[in-house]
């Protein structure tokens, strides 16, 4: 996350940290005791290690809950997958992961509400994650960083992205003058509007946070029926 501050230690109980065996990370969001949602491009053929209740990933407190992925589902629901072919398309950059055992709800491990209505253009929303804070260099913080950005009309991203795939199932968000953005390592994390999971960090330009460059987020409300069918 660029241009933000360390998240409040108790202010992200739904935020999951996803680890691949080779070390790269994504974020995810706890939906209920058994499932998290993340970006499809975070797909990994092997087991993903999932930390919940994590704040400082280098200094664990002992009340974190660690699970591994038992099953991964990409959109559409028929893609309960063995290979990553159905998960690699950014057009529907959303993936559900079933945990190997249920989490216990605590002060630091709780789900985030799904959206009840679309976020309005101009709304201020919060994006968070453990991604790099120093583009074009890559420096990953020990703690999640939060920043507030603005919901923009998708046409803004279409102009900035010049024929990139801006569909009705994505959202455009950022700041006109740059300086605040999600970035490398934040993929799969939440864009939160009015206390609800409005978007999932999907993609954007690099270096991040450039003026007239914006982040693209999976529009969660477009996949609500699918998510609720698990």
Curated annotation (Swiss-Prot):
PROSITE patterns: TRYPSIN_DOM, TRYPSIN_HIS, TRYPSIN_SER. It comes from the Eukaryota. GO terms for biological process: proteolysis. Extensively glycosylated, contains approximately 8 mol of monosaccharide per mol of toxin. The keyword Secreted applies. Its main location: secreted. Its EC number is 3.4.21.-. InterPro entries: Peptidase_S1_PA, Peptidase_S1_PA_chymotrypsin, Peptidase_S1A, Serine_Proteases_S1, Trypsin_dom, TRYPSIN_HIS, TRYPSIN_SER. Residues 1-230 form the Peptidase S1 domain. Keywords: Disulfide bond, Glycoprotein, Hydrolase, Protease, Secreted, Serine protease, Toxin. One of its GO terms (cellular component) is extracellular space. Expressed by the mandibular venom gland. Pfam families: Trypsin. It is found in: Secreted. Glycans are attached at residue 84. Gene3D superfamilies: Trypsin-like serine proteases. Disulfide bonds join 7-146, 26-42, 125-193, 157-172, 183-208. One of its GO terms (molecular function) is toxin activity. The active site is at 41 (charge relay system), 93 (charge relay system), 187 (charge relay system). Belongs to the peptidase S1 family. Has kallikrein-like activity, releases bradykinin from kininogen. Catalyzes the hydrolysis of various arginine ester substrates for trypsin and thrombin and degrades both angiotensin I and II by cleavage of the dipeptide Asp-Arg from the NH2-terminal end. Fibrinogen is also degraded but a fibrin clot is not produced. May have a potentiating effect on potent hemorrhagic toxins present in the venom. This is Gilatoxin. It comes from Heloderma horridum horridum.
